[in-house]
Amino acid sequence: MKRLSALLLAFACIASLQADPLASRNRASIDDSGTYRGNFALNQAAGDAQQQSNVRVVAVGSAALVGSDQRQHLQLDASQPIAASASISGAALRGSGILGVNQGAGLGNQQINAFRLSLSNGPESLDDSVLAQSVALTKVSGSATPVPGGRSVSTDDRAFAGSSGVVQVNQSAGVGNQSMNTLSVRVME
């Protein structure tokens, strides 16, 4: 009788997984993993049409100048309900240096982490083109209609604990989310 119960339970679990084969496709998870030193970039995507970017630009010299231009565009046709989850759990991603994490689950999430550092010994001017580097465009490129489904994002208190340096994290679950972290540092002698 115990074998029959165990067998029926196993078939029930398999049947529930087969009932929604897409459910696991929209789940991104980082658990108790990853230590780093120096520059570390991580893009994790679950689902469809995710756009993620981690950019690091460093310039050193008498007239050092840094810049980066990133554009993401996406047209979504989301008509099916989507359940999505993104989680960072346990003592994940602890270290020192520059860390960029993009974690997206669902459909059509756009994420950017940008870090720019310039070291120079000459004066520099700050004009509109430099200021525009840190602007996230507000043009909506996601789904025009709401898409039903449950979404969840979680980050454990132990994640990133003890990290030093620059930590940039974008974490989203759902449809058409846009997030951006940008940091520009200029050091002049």
UniProtKB/Swiss-Prot annotation:
Family under the similarity heading: Belongs to the FapB/FapC family.
Name under which the protein is recorded: Functional amyloid subunit FapB
Domain of life: Bacteria
Positions annotated as FapB_R repeat: 26-61, 85-120, 156-186
Record note on quaternary structure: A minor component of purified amyloid fibrils. Fibrils are resistant to boiling in 2% (weight/vol) SDS and require >90% (vol/vol) formic acid to dissolve.
Alphabetical keyword list: Amyloid, Cell adhesion, Fimbrium, Repeat, Secreted, Signal
GO (cellular component) term, any one: extracellular region
Function: A minor component of the functional amyloid in this bacterium. Probably nucleates fibril formation. Upon overexpression of the endogenous six-gene locus (fapA-fapF), cells form large clumps during liquid growth, make large amounts of biofilm and produce amyloid fibrils.
Disruption phenotype: Deletion of the entire fapA-fapF six-gene locus shows no visible growth phenotype.
Location in the cell: Fimbrium; Secreted
Species assigned in the record: Pseudomonas aeruginosa (strain ATCC 15692 / DSM 22644 / CIP 104116 / JCM 14847 / LMG 12228 / 1C / PRS 101 / PAO1)
Biological processes per GO annotation: amyloid fibril formation; cell adhesion
Secretion signal span: 1-19
